[in-house]
Design a protein with these regions (language model features):
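Generic detector of short, locally flexible boundary/turn motifs and exposed helical patches
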Residues: 52-58, 134-137, 216, 228-230
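Structural signature of Gram-negative outer-membrane beta-barrels, strongest in the C-terminal barrel
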Residues: 66, 85-89, 93-97, 147-257
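Glycine-centered flexibility motif
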Residues: 2-3, 16-19, 52, 91, ...
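Membrane-embedded beta-barrel scaffold of Gram-negative outer-membrane proteins
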Residues: 18-34, 38-44, 211-216, 242-257
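Outer-membrane beta-barrel proteins
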Residues: 1-16, 56-72, 147-148, 186-195, ...
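Face-selective signature of the C-terminal outer-membrane beta-barrel domain
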Residues: 15-38, 59-184
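Periplasmic-side early beta-strands and strand-to-turn transitions of outer-membrane beta-barrels
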Residues: 1-10, 38-52, 179-181, 186
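Flexible, surface-exposed loop regions and adjacent strand-edge segments
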Residues: 1, 45-54, 104-115, 186-195, ...
């Protein structure tokens, strides 16, 4: 497709507020609230088949509407236990998301289907098919999918940065996430839901043998629900499966020159 056919648009409204307070020299807190709305649309016309001087075109239109509400609160305290300094961070998050997604297949006026065949030319002419008949493509007639999703995530996290000495820092922490999702297939009249409770640990070690040299190692885990990042669908098979868990291990050396 051309630049007028293959398009991507994004409209977003974001409102964010943050409140910070210093309780003492060793204690501070922060509360953040964000509300956003966005509309995103992908539309593409692409080659799905090729045979000599003929090319078969297919396409889709994929609009998404999403509303998010984020709430985050955390408290940071510095505590000394003898010669060891602890920087303890605790917090909570709440995320609510309403998502609507639609998927349209292309509809060609000559075939009444999502595909049409054209003669290869430069530039391509998509107004006349390979049989010489005038044709027109529509991106909003043939709906393939329509879904709405409701997502709620509640999280609690804690991290302790332990300054054992001037050249040794240890970090330990983790977070607990409760993830609830319900996906309604408007076109099929069905719905699927799932709830996941996951604990994700993290830890790290930084050793500084010299002022300009740091040796570090870290380990962390994260997870991705079976609904994916776009929350478009959750079939019966995916609803019965545990989320994907990712492990990340990093070891390195940092030199300040």
């Amino acid at each position: 497709g051309g630049e007028d056919t293959n398009v991507q648009t994004l409209t977003a409204d974001i409102f964010k507020g943050t409140l910070r307070h210093q309780f003492s020299e060793t204690s501070k807190g922060q509360i953040s609230v964000q509300v956003d709305e966005f509309e995103k649309m992908y539309q593409n016309l692409y080659v799905s088949g090729y045979d000599g001087s003929l090319v078969t075109m297919d396409g889709y239109r994929d609009p998404t509407e999403r509303e998010n509400t984020f709430f985050d609160a955390n408290l940071v305290n510095e505590i000394n236990t003898g010669s060891v300094k602890h920087t303890l961070s605790i917090g909570a998050q709440r995320i609510e998301t309403d998502n609507s997604n639609y998927r349209y297949d292309t509809y060609w006026s000559t075939t009444g289907k999502d595909k049409e065949t054209f003669n290869v030319s430069t530039p391509m002419n998509f107004s006349v098919n390979s049989a010489g008949d005038p044709t027109r493509v529509d991106f909003t007639t043939k709906m393939n999918r329509s879904t709405t999703s409701e997502i709620e995530t509640t999280s609690f996290y804690v991290q302790d940065q332990i300054d054992v000495s001037d050249n040794l820092i240890v970090m330990l922490g983790g977070r607990i996430d409760k993830f609830d999702i319900k996906v309604n297939d408007v076109k099929a009249g069905t719905s699927q839901s799932r709830e996941d409770d996951e604990f994700s640990p993290r830890g790290g070690l930084i050793f500084k043998p010299h002022e300009n040299l740091s040796i570090y190692a870290s380990y962390s885990e994260s997870f991705l629900p079976r609904s994916g990042e776009q929350f478009k669908k959750l079939d019966a098979s995916a609803a019965s499966l545990d989320p994907d868990v990712f492990e990340n291990t990093e070891v390195g050396v940092k030199v300040d020159i």
